[in-house]
């Protein structure tokens, strides 16, 4: 395949489109009305080391796990084919014979971060920024928190602000875009670490009651009212209860057995921590 794209990130990628006859073409940005599917073709990152292909292949399985747990994913999930991941795009649609393009803005942009390398961003700050732009902040906050809990459980440490975005849908609704770049980043030979953390987060020993207290304080300081605050800790406890069956779910979704065993202790620890969240 010739050409390149302006797709960000370190993984080699190509935008591609599929026509009505099933043929694939590079997407030069002017596919017009002949395109029926809009996809991203993603290849392993050589610098990720000997498990680069494992990371990419299990990204497809991780998406199945997220879908089963009720997180927002694309209607059709990524497919690992011939050493590459074919990912449905959520910013393009074919509707009534026309190509429709949707607006997308990264979390860094929403939060006003100009220099990510020189900025320490916390999840509380991200949520404050989201409150100013999404249509239903309460629902998006629950979605955002559950995504990060699953990041922790499954070892997706690559959580920088370009790996989460806001999507403007055709009806004008603004909400978190479907989950993307979600995989076992803990396997990466580059020793990727979590970039965005919670105020009060302590790796391995986090007291989520403290995290929630910090979040409530920050939202109050920002004059963001939450009508049903109790739903937040309830959501987290409920999600934690589901994590107890996560290893079995991972197996059913096709995650490698070795990855399941590597994540098992962290999953159990997080489930125990979330069960300790106080209820009022």
Locate each region found by the language model.
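Anionic ligand-binding catalytic core segments
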Residues: 1-161, 165-280
């Amino acid at each position: 395949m010739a050409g390149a794209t302006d797709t960000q990130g370190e993984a080699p990628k190509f935008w591609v489109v599929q026509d009505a006859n099933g043929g694939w073409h590079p997407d030069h940005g002017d596919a017009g009305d002949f395109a029926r599917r809009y996809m991203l073709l993603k290849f392993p990152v050589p610098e990720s080391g000997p498990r680069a292909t494992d990371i990419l292949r299990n990204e497809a399985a991780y998406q199945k796990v997220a879908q089963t747990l009720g997180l927002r994913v694309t209607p059709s999930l990524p497919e690992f084919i011939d050493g590459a991941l074919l990912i449905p795009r959520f910013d393009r649609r074919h509707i009534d014979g026309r190509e429709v393009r949707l607006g997308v803005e990264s979390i860094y942009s929403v939060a006003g971060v100009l220099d990510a390398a020189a900025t320490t961003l916390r999840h509380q700050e991200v949520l404050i920024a989201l409150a100013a732009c999404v249509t239903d902040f309460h629902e998006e906050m629950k979605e955002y928190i559950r995504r990060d809990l699953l990041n922790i459980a499954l070892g997706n440490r690559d959580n920088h602000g370009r790996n989460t975005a806001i999507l403007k849908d055709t009806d004008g609704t603004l909400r978190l875009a479907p989950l993307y770049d979600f995989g076992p980043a803990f396997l990466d030979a580059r020793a990727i670490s979590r970039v965005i953390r919670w105020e009060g987060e302590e790796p391995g020993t986090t007291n989520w009651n403290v995290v929630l207290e910090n979040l409530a304080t920050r939202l109050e300081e920002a004059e963001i009212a939450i009508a049903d605050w109790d739903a937040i800790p309830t959501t987290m406890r409920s999600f934690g209860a589901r994590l107890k069956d996560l290893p079995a779910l991972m197996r059913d979704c096709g995650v490698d057995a070795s990855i399941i065993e590597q994540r098992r202790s962290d999953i159990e620890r997080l489930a125990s921590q979330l069960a300790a969240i106080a209820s009022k």
